[in-house]
Amino acid sequence: MMIEIGTTKYVIYAKVIVDGYVEKHDIIGAIFGQTEGLLGSDLDLRDLQKSGRIGRIDVELENINGKSYAKLIFPSSLDRVETAIIAATIETLDRVGPCIATIKVLNIEDIRIKKRQYITDRAKELLKSIVDTTIDTYEIAEEIKEFVRSEEIIEMGNEKLPSGPNVEDSDTIIIVEGRADVLNLLRCGIKNAIAVGGTSIPESIIELSKKKTTTIFTDGDRGGELILKEAIQTCDIDYVARAPKGREVEELTKKEVVKYLRSKIPIEQYIQFHSNKCNELLKKSKEYRSNTINNNNDSGKISIDSIISENATNDIGELPVSKTSKNERNNTKVIDENIEKNNQNIKEDNNIEIKQSDISEILKKDCSEQWEYIESLLNDISNTDNIKIITNDNIIKTIHYSELDKIDKSDIQMVMSDMPITQKITDLFHECSPIIIGRDINITKKPAKLKVFSHDMLKNMVCL
């Protein structure tokens, strides 16, 4: 049964059993008749109903086997004390007409609790609808930024390559694979990226690489490897950066983009890391670029696959750690032209400055055992960025390449590495005189007291 809530505060529920057949109006008449004058004029049911403080009394009646059963509903706008008094008064009813009757109050319901519950539930629904339809301020800002970034992408060259707005004016460029990569770098605030837009290197990028310092930043998959190989072959690449294996540049976060670009390495060091034929590659690559410029044809084109083996040292996505400065980059270019001469000069210097006994004293090994011992130490750090050092107390330590500038260099007798010895490493030890051993020697000048050896040079000397 539905009741009008209106100003109702409480609802009294009661049941009536009458020993005889009666109608609804008989029950209502008995209630008003038997309670009249019982509580005085203040709580008289007729007066309360006239004033609206007691609502319309609803009766649900059933007549079964000569008896009458009814449910009563009393809406009340009185306070809880007066409502309780009215409920108790109703229970004094003992007859309906000529029939014996009993009445029992079942419950007094506080309507305000239901109202509060309704308010709570409805407020939740309304709030949820507001939250679902509200656009977050961050989303608005990102949407606007995304639009601006997409507007910032320009088209360069006859091939209309997607690129950042600063490619023409910047001294450096970053070559990436596709438009999405350029867009992601724009999100990171990098505006000098240009996309290849396919698996072959466009002529516009080849020309740009001749004029600007060029970094190639490729995905960590097979496609990125192929583009990198062709770029090394056709462009004047200065640095190499790669996304982690199985990742793409377009999905990297800003922190990751900055991290991998900072970890870029010079092209010479990259090729040396992945092939023992690095000098041949550099020479042929340089000849190719020279022939392309002079003859404007493909007669000088070489196959990069024939120079960098598919099974080179590690996966091609793995790069040695390097934080090479611009000055060191310039020095590395000089090595291309003078590496054989420098290696010869360094070899002659070292033969004068170091004796067989120096190595024996450090390693505590006989001449016949020295190279095997050195080789075992080098095998421990093979294909890693780690370095072995031997202190003045003949303690052997393994450290990461990046920690070299943090250690006490005056306490070092020998440094062993599976990587090429660069100018940066020798500069770190310019005030000391340890023996430095590396796979190759890529330096243009050496401090007078420093003893620098490649693996082959040392092997030949200790095995004499």
UniProtKB/Swiss-Prot annotation:
Residues given in the record as Mg(2+) 2 binding sites: D219, D221
Cofactors: Mg(2+)
BP terms from Gene Ontology: DNA replication, synthesis of primer
Entry binding sites for Mg(2+) 1: E177, D219
GO MF annotations, alphabetized: DNA-directed RNA polymerase activity; metal ion binding; poly(A) binding
Keywords on record: DNA replication, DNA-directed RNA polymerase, Magnesium, Metal-binding, Nucleotidyltransferase, Primosome, Transcription, Transferase
Domain Toprim: 171-245
Pfam families listed in its UniProt record: Toprim_4
Assigned EC number: 2.7.7.101
Catalytic activity: ssDNA + n NTP = ssDNA/pppN(pN)n-1 hybrid + (n-1) diphosphate
Co-factor note (free text): Binds two Mg(2+) per subunit.
Enzyme class, UniProt record, top EC level: transferase
The keyword Metal-binding belongs to this UniProt entry's keyword annotation: yes
Domain of life: Archaea
Cited HAMAP family: DNA_primase_DnaG_arc
Entries under NCBIfam families matching the protein: PRK04031.1-1 (NF003108)
Family, as annotated: Belongs to the archaeal DnaG primase family.
Record's subunit section: Forms a ternary complex with MCM helicase and DNA.
PANTHER family: DNA PRIMASE
Function: RNA polymerase that catalyzes the synthesis of short RNA molecules used as primers for DNA polymerase during DNA replication.
Full protein name: DNA primase DnaG
Origin species: Methanococcus aeolicus (strain ATCC BAA-1280 / DSM 17508 / OCM 812 / Nankai-3)
Source lineage: Archaea, Methanobacteriati, Methanobacteriota, Methanomada group, Methanococci
